[in-house]
């Protein structure tokens, strides 16, 4: 065991907080206007019908309705919110 800290150990000991990214509301879930659907870096998932996009690329619902994930083209996905007809 070393009796001095050493040069490396005093420079360590930092860690950043998790960013808590990802899908917050899944397909088939009912959402109200303003609910966050996805937090993301970049546009991995595009905004579809009745979905807004924030300045940090967060996707959120513009209306009350049901979430649906759809294909944008072969590679990309989009998320839409459709009004419920109950």
UniProtKB/Swiss-Prot annotation:
The keyword Magnesium does not apply. GO terms for biological process: translation. Gene3D superfamilies: 2.40.50.100. It holds the Pfam family Ribosomal_L27. Belongs to the bacterial ribosomal protein bL27 family. NCBIfam families: L27. The keyword Chloroplast applies. This is Large ribosomal subunit protein bL27c. It comes from Guillardia theta. Transmembrane segments: none annotated. One of its GO terms (cellular component) is chloroplast. Signal peptide: none annotated. It is found in: Plastid, Chloroplast. It comes from the Eukaryota. Coiled coil: none annotated. Residues 7-19 have a biased composition (Polar residues). GO terms for molecular function: structural constituent of ribosome. Keywords: Chloroplast, Plastid, Ribonucleoprotein, Ribosomal protein. Residues 1-20 are annotated as: Disordered.
């Amino acid at each position: 065991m070393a009796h001095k800290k050493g040069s490396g150990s005093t420079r360590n000991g930092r860690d950043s907080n998790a960013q808590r990214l990802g899908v917050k509301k899944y397909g088939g879930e009912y959402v109200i206007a303003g609910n966050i659907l996805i937090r993301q870096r970049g546009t991995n998932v595009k905004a579809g019908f009745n979905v807004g996009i924030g300045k940090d690329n967060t996707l959120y619902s513009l209306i009350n309705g049901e979430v649906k994930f759809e294909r944008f083209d072969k590679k990309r996905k989009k998320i839409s919110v459709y009004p419920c007809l109950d």
